């Protein structure tokens, strides 16, 4: 029927036109930009983690932004332009030699967000090129189910999730908590 055709087309349009981009924002404005995007109904993500700051007389838990001056924006072409109208947003991240904004694949974003939500270990962003690690699935601990690469950084085993252009998000991971994924997957 015509109605179901329209519905299908709309569904396809919505599914295919929204992509994850990295908006570069003014220092310390990540959360303000995110709040404004929320009000506009544009999905976004600012990766934060809790850090404990210790002084001699007290300790305080603060939320630190993992990727300063960056906000992930899930937008269609029209929304993508609207975001650039913010005075606090300078531009989108673009790969060297390209003109259109870099897209972070949905699967990478899903893994990254899962890691941030569930990791009990601190997550560090490693922007230096990291040799490809063995593809593994976490089978124990809070990150069970996460697929990533097992890498060694400074002699410690870590699970790494690659993000196009941004490098890898890494967290300490005992080797016994992962199993290799065969080529069958």
Each model region followed by its residue ranges:
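Short, small-residue-biased leader/transition segments that mark boundaries at the very start
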Residues: 1-7
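Basic nucleic-acid-binding interfaces
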Residues: 13-137, 177-185
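Short, surface-exposed beta-strand-loop junctions and turns on beta-sheet-rich folds
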Residues: 90, 166-169
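Short beta-strand-centered aromatic/proline hotspots
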Residues: 145-152
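A generic beta-sheet turn/junction motif
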Residues: 152-154, 165
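A short macromolecule-binding patch
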Residues: 160, 168-178
């Amino acid at each position: 029927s015509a109605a179901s055709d329209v519905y299908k087309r709309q569904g396809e349009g919505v599914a295919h036109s929204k992509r994850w981009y990295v908006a570069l924002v003014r220092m310390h404005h990540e959360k303000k930009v995110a709040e404004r995007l929320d009000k506009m109904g544009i999905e976004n993500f600012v990766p934060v983690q809790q850090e404990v700051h210790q002084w001699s007389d007290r300790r305080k838990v603060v939320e630190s932004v993992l990727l300063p001056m960056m906000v992930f924006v899930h937008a269609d072409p029209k929304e993508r332009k609207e975001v650039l109208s913010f005075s606090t947003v300078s531009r989108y991240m673009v790969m060297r030699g390209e003109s259109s904004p870099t897209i972070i694949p949905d699967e990478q974003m899903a893994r990254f967000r899962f890691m941030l939500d569930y990791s009990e270990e601190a997550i560090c962003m490693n922007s230096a090129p990291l040799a490809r690690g063995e593809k593994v699935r976490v089978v124990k601990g809070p990150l069970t189910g996460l697929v990533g690469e097992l890498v060694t950084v400074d002699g410690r085993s870590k699970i790494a999730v690659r993000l196009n252009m941004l490098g890898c998000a890494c967290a300490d991971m005992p080797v016994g908590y992962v199993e290799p994924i065969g080529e069958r997957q």
